[in-house]
From Swiss-Prot:
It comes from the Bacteria. Phosphatase that hydrolyzes non-canonical purine nucleotides such as XTP and ITP to their respective diphosphate derivatives. Probably excludes non-canonical purines from DNA/RNA precursor pool, thus preventing their incorporation into DNA/RNA and avoiding chromosomal lesions. This is Inosine/xanthosine triphosphatase. It comes from Photobacterium profundum (strain SS9). Mg(2+) binds at residue 68. Its cofactor is Mg(2+); Mn(2+). Binds 1 divalent metal cation per subunit; can use either Mg(2+) or Mn(2+).
Amino acid sequence: MSKIIVASANPAKISAVASAFSQAFPEQSFTVEGISVASEVRDQPLCADETLLGARNRVKNARKLQADADFYVGLEAGIDGGFTFAWMVIENHKQRGEARSASLPLPPIALEKIQQGIELGDVMDDMFNQQNVKQKGGAIAMLTNHTLSRSSVYQQALILALIPFMNEQWFPCR
């Protein structure tokens, strides 16, 4: 059984990781554990590079806390222009996979509040009169009338980040 450390305590992220690994490797068993670690970037990254750095830093910091895992997964959501998205970073002892999720357009009112320093999750809570949207379906669920969720969109990007692990013969070790 392989041990996966998710560099987040967010249930939506942990669920997405568990689903992605189960789909990518249906013949294997996994234990999935979420731990809180620093991203070392702003709470709301405001460009693609900062968002990717946050995901990489989460993996780096998770490895320091739990050196015995088989896989480490960092997910970091960010804003770039008028869109929100997330970077996925997956590492084991010899390989790294990275992928970016689909981009979701944000309403102008949300972007204005984000520019004032308010996190997207808090903006969504306010706009939709909800609590803790970011740990449930996220902005994605709210803006798609629950057609998609944060977890479902992240799951697809995680499977893409797993490509080097699913096709080791085509991806030299880093």
